[in-house]
Amino acid sequence: MLGDWSDGPHALPETLAAALVSLIGAGFVPAGSALPAQRDCATALGVSRGTVAAAYGALEARGYLVSVQGSGTRVRSGSNQAPALVEGRLFSFTHTPVDTIDLSTGALPASPVTGEVLREGVEEELAPYLETDGYFPAGLPVLRQAVADHLSRTGIPTQAQQVLITSGSQQATFLTMRSLVGQGDLALTEDPSYRGGLEALRTVGARIEGIRTTREGLDLGLLARALARKPAVLYCQTGIHNPTGQTMPHGARLDLATMINRSGVPTVEDCCSYDLTVSGPPATTLARLVEPELLINLGTLSKLFWGGLRIGWIRASPTRIRTLLELRKVEDLATSVIDQLHAVSLLRRAPDARRQRQAMLASHLKTTEDAVHEHFPHWTWDPIKGGSGLWVDTHGDALALAEMAKRVKVKLAPGPGFSPYDGHRSMLRLPVWHEPELLRQALQLITGSK
């Protein structure tokens, strides 16, 4: 079950511990199961007994295992496992002290075109809606059409009845997961994955299985075996992936779509970053490839425009949209009419916003990479295709680094927060949009804290 567990740049005990966590998290080694004796495990894996002892010891310290005299080492109940020392995405927005440099989130400031549009106001457009009760649970018809037109222009053919407007993409994610996943249901995600998606799945009580994801996208061999177990949902990002900034190659995307269609597993494709490319048009998605009844796309205004306008959407079949609409009515009735009217105006300026974002990110990406090379020359990363962050391998303990950084008032986002298994412990997600002076100050503080 461990497969090629020893592949990787890290020490064998750390690598073995991470592989065991993956098996435990995926349910292959259930709570209460006995692990092989250290000597037997070492012989089977071809490593020293010390390597196994160190891995077992690390997992016992983190609450995954328990050793009982005379009974060996067993998997501890999931309810007793100690959480990794990381903070979720939603936590990061509300618990950062004002005197702290926050490098834990990739959320962007408003694009210039956003300020221009908001200053113009919507007084004339608002007047007819003041004669109504103001509640439009599915979204204003004019915005549903504007989103459909925007998606169609960017390669995702859409009709207005396929769109449900939400109060941001996080609500879109939670509504979708509540409609598909029940307590204890199996849900597949990439590993690493978007923190908000993982939080939504945990909230609905999903049993999450992470599928190894590299610069080439999901490991389709592992995914095929997981799909055979008929999960409730597959959550993925084939366009611009958060946190890695990569995009799935065309051939792999075609293979993935074929697997989804054959399996019949509902698939939630998070497209929130798909138009945040470093250059060129928006990234390709699964929209033309997967059967419409199986695919749900999530989107937002936050990336191109501003997160302060809480506008997101769900794109799905009309039948599924009707189901989601009933859930949405229980959630918060409707999204702000004023924000929706601003959104209509903003979507007309999407090409301008995309050019502004690409220019800003291209400039800041270069200064971010230069600053990181200067302060941490041994850190490495793959060139990104888009998004607002670098997925950086520190080749060390990123959790420990984040704790040290916290003492000098710098907040980091270590890799375990992006993993269903607390994996990627050497990784950091660093935002690329900060001004060079602030970023260099933060990196200098981190350097001094070590």
Segments and roles (model prediction):
Residues 1-123, 325, 329-336, 363, ...:
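N-terminal basic, amphipathic alpha-helical segments
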Residues 315, 391-393, 431-433:
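Short hydrophobic/aromatic beta-strand micro-patches
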Residues 104-149:
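Exposed, interaction-prone assembly regions rather than primary DNA-binding/catalytic cores
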Residues 66-67, 158, 412:
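Short beta-strand "wing" residues that participate in macromolecule-binding interfaces
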Residues 291-358:
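Conserved core segment of the aminotransferase class I/II
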Residues 131-263, 275-276, 280-292:
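Conserved core of the PLP fold type I
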Residues 361-369, 379-393:
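Conserved glycine-rich beta-strand-loop-beta hairpin in the small C-terminal domain of fold type I
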Residues 408-429:
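Conserved PLP cofactor-binding pocket of PLP-dependent enzymes
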